[in-house]
Each structure stands twice: as structure tokens, then as C-alpha cells.
Amino acid sequence: YKGEKPAVIDFYATWCGPCRMVAPLLKSLAKEYKDQIVVYKVDTDKQKELSAAMGIQSLPTIIFIPKTGQPQIIIGAANKTTFRKAIEEVLLKE
């Protein structure tokens, strides 16, 4: 990963109910951590090749990509506490 900040990638679809539940949580966390991380959203219906290349089979799939180390994946809807823990422990730990 070559970005300047750790990243969160949210693979979603507009028709996906759990994706719609997760979206405002990630938006809120993106604001909260705006100086520390970058949040990307990928519509799997519009970005089929990227989704296939990343092996996305279930929605939502959220990938936490640290500057160094292995990415971590959460598949399915999770709560804000779970996402915050992943940001703190995977992306921001020193």
C-alpha cells in the first residue's frame, strides 16, 4: 500500500440493506479520524473488475489497510465500536 495515510475501503451496493446501515457509521468515523485515515467507498455494481480482483463475495466488505502490516477484513454489518476498534488497533497502532 502506497498511500500517505492508512485506509478503509468499503465495498458496498446500493441495494444492500446492511451496507446502508454501515454507511453512516463509516461516514461519521471518517470525519472523526479525518486527519489520520482515508475512507474509500467502492460500489461493487459499478466497479465489478476491482471487486472481482479483490475477491469480494459478500457485502458489505470493509478492508482496513495499515501503512505497514497485513490488511484486516470485516465482512457484514458491524457496529461503530467494532469499526473504531479496527481503526485504533489495525490502522493507528504504532
Model-derived segments and spans:
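Typically the conserved alpha-helix immediately C-terminal to a functionally engaged Cys/Sec
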Residues: 20-33
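The canonical Cys-X-X-Cys-His
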Residues: 16-19, 62
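Non-catalytic, surface beta->alpha helical segment in thiol-disulfide oxidoreductase systems
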Residues: 58, 63-94
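Structural micro-motif
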Residues: 7, 48, 54-65
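Conserved acidic residues
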Residues: 43-45
